[in-house]
Amino acid sequence: MRPTSGITLGGRYQLTDRIAIGGMGEVWKARDKVLGRITAVKILKEEYTGDPNFLRRFRAEAQHTALLNHPGVANVYDYGEEKGSAYLVMELVPGQPLSSILEKEKVLSPERTLRIIAQTAAALSAAHAQGLVHRDVKPGNLMITPTGRVKVTDFGIARLADQVPLTATGQVMGTAQYLAPEQATGQQATGSSDLYSLGIIGYEALAGHRPFTGESQIAIALAQVNDTPPPLPDTVPAPVRALIMCMLSKDPRERPSDAAALSDAADALRRKDTRGAVEAVPALAAFLEEQGVADPSGAETAPLDYDGMRTTHPRAEGTRADGSPATAALPVTTAQPRTDDAARGTGAAGAAAACAAAAFGATASARTRDHEIAAVRDQQTRPG
């Protein structure tokens, strides 16, 4: 059945206007004739309804999202299959995707970026608490309401940590531009993988571009594994730069320990409370040193001017009085650079190539994947 305006699904959901077309389906605005409310209906494309794998994945999206009850996640109301079509009835979220905002505005302020990170991480924390990993966190899946609230959408490729994945062994679901290194090397995605993807979003919002680019999905996936992110602009306050680089660690153990901690750290930096951010994410201390800010527990501090975007931190002439509140800024020191993350993940080129080829759920043949893997290995071993 091809969706058109006026069609009623399940005897109840009358389609009115098409909102968007995605890779797997269409999203329509609809009126619930029973409850009288306006909803969003996601309808699986006809070419996929006959594919058992796609149908299972679509059902899984309904089941996964229905597990969650959080203001930062778009609610699922119903699911049905009718006349060869499968549909998912969801909360209609007003606003626009972050991808559209970034396309128009290019760069967001540190405060606005931190707010998006904090709210998204809080929603992901609710998903992770249910054992649910999103696996495709990207700007297009973050709806921003007119009041600035974030709603995480599209759990279509999410995976419960204790269930067998629907994808084939060695195949990756996700978008290469936001793919965590462990996903790009064929390892199982975890909650930390979602935080890495959110770090890419934060970088893009602050810099106006993504940290890794390439001529193909394979090249971008390899960059996620092997390359160090370019420094963020100096106009971004050092503690904010440090948080983003912490999220973009190649080693998941160097990222924030969980989404709730990340949300707390981002909120702390919004309050200009660097010490509070380090208490939430202890791993952040090493990245602060890398940005020229050291000793989060030290007594000597100078205020951080977020409004003026001052990123140099002259040492305060005196120390804080006993009992005074912790400030957001920290003294300057000459930091020793940490070991380059690019050294990590070597030897994973073949897996990264296979993952990039399989992005968006593509089902490349074994012969094609072998050819791609060989090409990437040849590229890495070629002199010069």
Where are these regions (language model features)?
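Eukaryotic protein kinase
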Residues: 1-306, 311
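C-terminal or otherwise distal, non-catalytic regulatory regions appended to signaling enzyme catalytic cores
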Residues: 296-384
